[in-house]
């Protein structure tokens, strides 16, 4: 299972990108949200690897929350990767969480390819879905803090000291957060 790709952006279209990873070029389907946020030559995408009888497809996302939303959507009967990607293209994970919390069937129907029956099914199937999960995973700072906290715990630091140190750090990148927190933890 391929869960992520990092490499050089070879080409970029609204629905897919080609990413060169160590000499192998992968075609990765992306949402319009990810397409508009892509910049630069180097790209890192969280991916969902969908294996069908006739194809193996990669769907890529800049945000972990968008990937979690996509993977939850394709588990719904009648919602395939194309419809799930259309939802991810229409709404950010936090916007879709609001739609779910409000049970807004007309907002779901605004997505191309979704009629009233499918919209109702999506709202029913996702009624117990933890929208906080996709919102928190979409915020890079909170994701980086969680990863940094995990790394520091594996080094043997106590959770309360880790929380205190990370609370004083301002970085958004996991590696920089760990470095800053380590400096602070040495003084505590």
UniProtKB/Swiss-Prot annotation:
It comes from the Bacteria. One of its GO terms (molecular function) is four-way junction DNA binding. Keywords: Cytoplasm, DNA damage, DNA recombination, DNA repair, DNA-binding. Residues 140-188 are annotated as: Domain III. GO terms for biological process: DNA recombination; DNA repair. Residues 63-135 are annotated as: Domain II. GO terms for cellular component: cytoplasm; Holliday junction helicase complex; Holliday junction resolvase complex. It is found in: Cytoplasm. Residues 135-139 are annotated as: Flexible linker. The keyword Flavoprotein does not apply. SUPFAM superfamilies: Nucleic acid-binding proteins, RuvA domain 2-like. Its main location: cytoplasm. Residues 1-62 are annotated as: Domain I. The RuvA-RuvB-RuvC complex processes Holliday junction (HJ) DNA during genetic recombination and DNA repair, while the RuvA-RuvB complex plays an important role in the rescue of blocked DNA replication forks via replication fork reversal (RFR). RuvA specifically binds to HJ cruciform DNA, conferring on it an open structure. The RuvB hexamer acts as an ATP-dependent pump, pulling dsDNA into and through the RuvAB complex. HJ branch migration allows RuvC to scan DNA until it finds its consensus sequence, where it cleaves and resolves the cruciform DNA. Homotetramer. Forms an RuvA(8)-RuvB(12)-Holliday junction (HJ) complex. HJ DNA is sandwiched between 2 RuvA tetramers; dsDNA enters through RuvA and exits via RuvB. An RuvB hexamer assembles on each DNA strand where it exits the tetramer. Each RuvB hexamer is contacted by two RuvA subunits (via domain III) on 2 adjacent RuvB subunits; this complex drives branch migration. In the full resolvosome a probable DNA-RuvA(4)-RuvB(12)-RuvC(2) complex forms which resolves the HJ. Has three domains with a flexible linker between the domains II and III and assumes an 'L' shape. Domain III is highly mobile and contacts RuvB. Belongs to the RuvA family. This is Holliday junction branch migration complex subunit RuvA. It comes from Sulfurimonas denitrificans (strain ATCC 33889 / DSM 1251). The gene is ruvA.
């Amino acid at each position: 299972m391929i869960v992520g790709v990092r490499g050089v952006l070879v080409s970029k279209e609204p629905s897919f990108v080609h990413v060169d990873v160590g000499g192998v070029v992968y075609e990765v389907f992306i949402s319009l949200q990810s397409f508009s946020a892509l910049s630069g030559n180097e790209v890192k995408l969280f991916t969902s690897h969908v294996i069908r009888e006739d194809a193996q497809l990669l769907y890529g996302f800049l945000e972990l929350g968008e990937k979690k939303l996509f993977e939850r959507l394709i588990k719904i009967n009648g919602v395939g990767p194309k419809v799930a990607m259309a939802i991810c293209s229409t709404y950010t994970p936090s916007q879709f969480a609001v739609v779910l919390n409000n049970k807004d069937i007309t907002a779901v129907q605004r997505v191309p390819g979704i009629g009233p029956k499918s919209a109702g099914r999506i709202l029913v199937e996702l009624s117990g879905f933890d929208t906080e999960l996709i919102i928190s995973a979409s915020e890079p700072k909170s994701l980086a803090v969680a990863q940094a906290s995990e790394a520091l715990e594996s080094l043997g630091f106590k959770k309360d000291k880790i929380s205190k140190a990370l609370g004083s750090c301002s970085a958004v990148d996991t590696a920089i957060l760990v470095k800053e927190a380590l400096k602070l933890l040495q003084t505590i």
